[in-house]
């Protein structure tokens, strides 16, 4: 698959449209699950296996503010590539 500019902007718009605020203020803090679910859908459509993992070290999580990590893998050989990024916004 060759990446294209319209495809990039479509995904960028979709990511920006999903709220994922991390805040010490409990009134603002929300889950990043909508972003993780979207990314998993995109990766799975491209042949990746995805695993959602609860983020360690976060206290007092409820379903409304649960923080998740996404691990997407493809292939089984030695070596590989790791990409890491944030899926939340901080006010």
Where is each model-derived feature located?
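Acidic/His- and Gly-rich active-site-bordering loop/insert found
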Residues: 2-91
């Amino acid at each position: 698959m060759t990446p294209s500019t319209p495809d990039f902007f479509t995904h960028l718009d979709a990511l920006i449209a999903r709220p994922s605020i991390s805040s010490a203020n409990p009134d603002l803090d929300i889950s990043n699950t909508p972003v993780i679910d979207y990314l998993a859908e995109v990766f799975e459509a491209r042949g990746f296996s995805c695993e959602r993992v609860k983020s360690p070290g976060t206290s007092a999580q409820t379903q409304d503010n649960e923080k998740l990590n996404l691990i997407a893998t493809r292939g089984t050989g030695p070596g590989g590539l790791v990409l890491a990024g944030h899926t939340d916004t901080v006010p």
